[in-house]
Amino acid sequence: MKRSEIDRSKLSPMMKHYVELKDKYEDTIILYRLGDFYEMFFEDAEEVAHALELTLTGKSAGLDERVPMCGIPHHAAEVYIDKLIKKGYKVAICEQLEDPKTAKGIVKRDIVEVISSGTVINTNSLNEKENNYIGCLYDFSYGFVLTYSDITTGEVYSELLTNNTDDVIYKILSLDIKELIVNELINKVLLSKIRSLKIPVTIQNELLNDKYQNIYQNISDARIVNSIKLLLYYLDVLQKRNLSHFQEVVIKEKEQYLEMDIHTKRNLELTECLRTKERTYSLLWLLDNTKTAMGSRKLKYFIENPLLDINKINKRYDIVSKLLEEFILAEELRNDLYEVYDLERLCGKLSFGSANGKDLLQLKASLKVLPSIKEKLEKLGFYEKITTMSDLYDLLEKSIYEEPPNTIKEGYLIKDGYSSELDELKDLSRGGKDFISRFETEERERTGIKGLKVGFNKVFGYYIEISKSYLNMVTDDMGYIRKQTLANCERFINPILKEKEDLILSSEDKIINLEYNLFIEIRDKCKEYIPELQRTAKVISEIDVLSSFALVSEKYNYIRPIITNGNEIKVLNSRHPVVERVLKGEEYVPNDIVMDNNTDILLITGPNMAGKSTYMRQLGIIAIMAQIGCFVPAEEATLPIFDKIFTRIGASDDLVSGESTFMVEMMEASRAIKYATRNSLILFDELGRGTATFDGMSLAQAILEYVANKIKCKTLFSTHYHELTDMEKTIPNLKNKHVSAVEENGNITFLHKVKDGSVDKSYGINVAKLAGLPDEVIDRASGILNIYENKEKKTDTIIQTTLPLNFDEKKSEVEEEVKNIDILNITPIEAINILSKLREKVK
């Protein structure tokens, strides 16, 4: 049955109200509160019953047939809502706004909140280590503004983007934005691409009034302000969110942070492993020894936004150095940080009015350690201050029970002694319950019925229960009124018991209502501290990150780099921080990376799997570590400030446009040489390999010449085109490097040491042998290689290389494993692990 086909004049008042709400919230699933259940009707019911595997039933609504219906218990609603959100639905919560017991006529109901993938506030459904961003993309004809916010923390960011739609897409993907609001001017091609990524999109033009002007009052750019107000309208008006905890908008300006596109972040495996898409084996995984959820999120932000300001970087170094010097103090500080809960998201709960008793206890526990943290920060000379908010701690200490329930409408929230009125009601209630206990004893003595019990349930209230074996002792003069007969007993009431019941239940209702009102007062008082709590959260998250840097630096022997305004690179005995940690039973081979004022390009040759890609990634990661304020894995390090990093490492097809590997290579090369400056870093791994040999070699040489003569930025360029190494003779700012290997009796040993000069062999067949390819294949490949190397006639070569191959069929476990390796997408870390396992199998 479809809503559009029914005769609305016949609907019951309740169902008519539901249909009117559904007309307003057409794009949502409405959960309509009826007693202890949220119910769905018509198409919503059919869709949700299928999506969540619920029983589809029907409900009388005044029509000739029952309307489709399904329902979920209100106490378990969060679980079901979470499932719906993950399936891409929006959910509108329609609550009862008055007590059904006292309502006259139909109970008042209305939508109180709308939940979508970008506006989830249930922290149990979110990853505490990551932000959950909702974004607003504002198209102003010749560019875009992207404003995005994590509504659970109140953080809001805004940045101007070019009109390059691919750049916009990659920015959205890089931020992992869960939901997007766009204005009606939006580029239709871009909109189609966004929707193809399964990101929910809402188109609207309405801007919010100046209700939350305080968060953007210092911004003069009307485009940015309009983008912010577009997002605020969606959150405030359409989703009915209280945004009083929203912080001042941070404008992300290119002059402040090192620029990296999504390809660079993925190629360098900054926040997730390229192959598994998980944190493990990423730089974030290595550096994250934070003690708080806020610190973990802040660390991710640091890694994705390295600084350009040397003074700010050195301030971070100074704190890390101090933490290493004061190691006992640092450990005590980390112990204190462990006691701090997620203050940012607690502020969100206070603002939304969803904080319960347990949330306030978490706030109290966090406030308790602030004096100790403040004292330690002062000893460390930390550049930010915190306040302890002792008056708020005192309020929570004297008011909230140590073990409150999950809801705030059950009572047992407020401590004795906080409210004299509440204490009086509790005394009355306890006195009544004491009476019940005495009454049971007295009745046993008066009647002689030893099996007499006094019980309680919500249907009958208090009752007297007598088992069947004692029923013959019940007489009329006892004054018992039979109420219920069960299999093994009967239940009675009497006037005295009912009188006390009314008194007890009346006082308990009053207690629950008073506790609720007192709790709301206390929560509202906490809400007044949100700005102060957010400032404190910012300081704690930053010191947590720097404390993690100190711990990792001490543990893995990192050193403080020297950052200069020049362009020289001198990193001695450097290591790849992640690779060295995952090598099992093998010693990591460190390498120097030295590029003086006269050297802009290192052209790197060497065997496959020898470590060229690792060497290149190593410099990129060390540069990023240095610019986020972390010490680096080396014996000595002097580095310039890089404004941008461009990479092309590994081979993969485009995520969005479906372009081929070679096309993506050229697009990324184009982006690098178009936008790179003298202060940028370019890392190109075997550029040009995706096409014919001479095409690829020509392009590689032309790109190298352009970088050397026009851009003159620091560049690491690996290649198998050995002819390119002759460029060292004609380009003075290019130097050859090679990754050394030793060949003996047809076997190759990787030394993983980068040395001056070039090599003239790729050792591809040796690597194939090491990987476990069958001997027949290796022998045949060696023969063909000899033909090419001996420069036989072309026709003869073709004949020779197309002779029928009579390999014996032979399958082995190693062969099957080698076949299954995804060579194009494998990372150096994974390759090392796979080769190690294969080598063990063929020993």
What feature does the model see in each segment?
Residues 352, 356, 366-369, 416-417, ...:
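Charged, surface-exposed helical/loop "interaction arms" that form contiguous linear patches used
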Residues 356, 837-841:
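Short, small/acidic-rich helices and loops at N termini and domain boundaries
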Residues 59-70, 157, 212-218, 269-271, ...:
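Short hinge/gating elements
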Residues 42-45, 221, 291, 296-302, ...:
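ATPase nucleotide-binding head domains, primarily ABC-like/P-loop NTPase cores
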Residues 1-322, 335-338, 342-351, 355-441, ...:
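Charged catalytic and DNA/RNA-contacting regions of genome-maintenance
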Residues 206-211, 259, 274, 365-434, ...:
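Amphipathic heptad-repeat alpha-helical coiled-coil/stalk segments that mediate oligomerization
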Residues 486-524:
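Extended, charged coiled-coil "arm/hinge" scaffolds of SMC/Rad50-like chromosome-maintenance ATPases
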Residues 94, 117-126, 242, 378-381, ...:
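Active-site phosphate-binding and catalytic loops of NTP-dependent enzymes
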